[in-house]
Amino acid sequence: FFKIVKILILFLLLAFVGAGFYAGNIAYETLLTAPWEKILGVTKHRADLSRMHSREEKDGWQPVEIRSADGTKLHGTYIESSRESPYTVILLHGLYQNRSMSMPYADMYRDMGYNVLLIDQRGHGESGGSHTTWGLRETDDLDAWTEWLREKDGGVKIGMHGVSLGAAMALIYSGTEKGKEISFYVADSAYGGMMELGK
């Protein structure tokens, strides 16, 4: 009798461990490949950009579309200062947001005489990609944006202002070779580590 019970317990234990590995593998694959909207039910960051589009039309702001190194389409809006300026600041929004959330900062920088580039980070707004890569591909994206600015104006001096996820991306970029060419960084409410995102 005890031999049968031991075999049954061993079988149940192996089945439980096997089911755990299977479920863990499914969760891992989902987190790597599924869009954030599917995982978290969040769609706001893909939502309404009509206010941005109306300002583009009304105020003559320039909609911009470029491609990152991996071919991902990236969208942004370039706003020229009312007075001639060699300075342009790139505004990086937070997680689950889009470039329209950076508009108050755009107004602030324009009042100080800066040109402004508001961007949708990958997986957000109108930019391609299903989710953020937490800096893995975003540094390539920022390379592409800074290159676009330098092609537009060879003498441009670039600053970068990020909020939350955008601040973290700015800090990550500051450690890259091309990131050292940026004139200044503003990191507003950056998180110190990935664990803080779960709080």
Regions from the PLM with identified roles:
Residues A69-E80:
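A short loop-to-beta-strand scaffold at the N-terminal edge of the catalytic core in hydrolase folds
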Residues M108-G128:
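Conserved alpha/beta-hydrolase
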Residues T132-D153:
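Alpha/beta-hydrolase active-site loop
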Residues L95-M108, Q121:
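The serine-hydrolase catalytic nucleophile loop
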Residues F11-R67:
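An N-terminal hydrophobic leader/cap segment in hydrolases
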Residues D153-S164:
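Alpha/beta-hydrolase fold nucleophile elbow
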Residues P86-G94:
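Short beta-strand element of the alpha/beta-hydrolase
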Residues I172-K199:
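Hydrolase active-site cap/lid region
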